[in-house]
A protein has these predicted regions:
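Conserved alpha/beta-hydrolase "acid-adjacent" motif
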Residues: 204-209
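Active-site nucleophile elbow and catalytic-triad environment of alpha/beta-hydrolase enzymes
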Residues: 171-187, 201
Length: 272
């Protein structure tokens, strides 16, 4: 697997840990990897890079209060993270990009597509819920925070924030997850780019919620990987990589033999 070049960049006054892969000529389109919540780029990028490293120019960054990027005022709310993603796309990638987002990264990808559709070529949304009321309460309102020695050591090694901020960040994440995101079916129906909804069959949210997300987006595909959880990217990396490769091979609207959801659009396309 090709390594990414990793360094800090100044993103509109904030030092953000950024990663970039090799560019493969003019036909090599950018793809931005969006990590999950309370995570970082290096904790998951190796699971998906093999799917795109020979076909795309790979970009990634640690969001504020994640990985090697310090926290700042407003961090963790999804509107804040969406605006930060838009700034990164505009300033670092400098144009429209494909997005691959896991968990919170998938949420942010959908929100970027809603707020700035001109910047999004396609989305792979992995283990993504569109609303906090997703069929299962993920966290308690006032959870007891237990930080292992290993997690504390990783935070101290990576984060520019002082040690006490680790608990502050975790509590803020739980607070946000109990009230955000709040996307609606009507909003999702406005997403026009190709979307692959990729999920485990035993996510922390309901399968019904996943189906709602898939059926709401006009140009979406659905992949449910059997025998996996929210960590589908790590549990069955090869299958996930294959699904992503297949998605990128043909981003045109899917024409199938016996469509139901796609029947009306299929008939329109066949008339042309």
């Amino acid at each position: 697997m090709r390594k990414l070049t990793r360094n800090y960049i100044n993103l509109r006054g904030h030092q953000v840990w950024s990663a970039q892969g090799k560019t493969f000529g003019k036909k090599s389109e950018p793809v931005l990897l969006m990590h999950g919540g309370l995570s970082s780029t290096e904790s998951w990028d190796y699971t998906v890079i093999p799917a795109v490293q020979r076909t795309h120019s790979v970009f990634a960054y640690d969001r504020s209060a994640h990985g090697r990027t310090a926290s700042r005022e407003g961090f963790y709310h999804f509107d804040f993270q969406t605006d930060e993603a838009i700034a990164y796309i505009e300033d670092a990638i400098k144009g429209p990009t494909h997005l691959i987002g896991w968990s919170d990264g998938g949420i942010i990808s959908l929100m970027v597509a809603l707020k700035r559709p001109d910047l999004v070529k396609s989305i792979v949304a992995i283990g993504t819920n569109y609303h906090f009321d997703s069929g299962l309460s993920l966290v308690e309102e006032d959870p007891e925070i237990v930080i292992s020695e290993d997690d504390a050591a990783k935070f101290a090694l990576r984060s520019p924030d002082p040690a006490h901020m680790q608990e502050v960040i975790i509590r803020k994440a739980y607070e946000v997850w109990n009230s955000e995101p709040t996307m609606t079916i009507a909003q999702l129906s406005r997403i026009s780019c190709p979307v692959l909804v990729l999920t485990g069959d035993d996510e922390p949210f309901s399968n019904h919620h996943t189906i709602e997300l898939y059926e709401a987006i006009p140009n979406a595909r659905l992949a449910i990987v059997p025998g996996t959880s929210h960590f589908v990217v790590k549990e069955k990396s090869k299958i996930v990589q294959g699904l992503i490769k297949d998605f990128y091979r043909d981003l045109d609207y899917p024409i199938t033999i016996w469509p139901r959801l796609r029947k009306e659009q299929t008939e329109k396309l066949k008339e042309k």
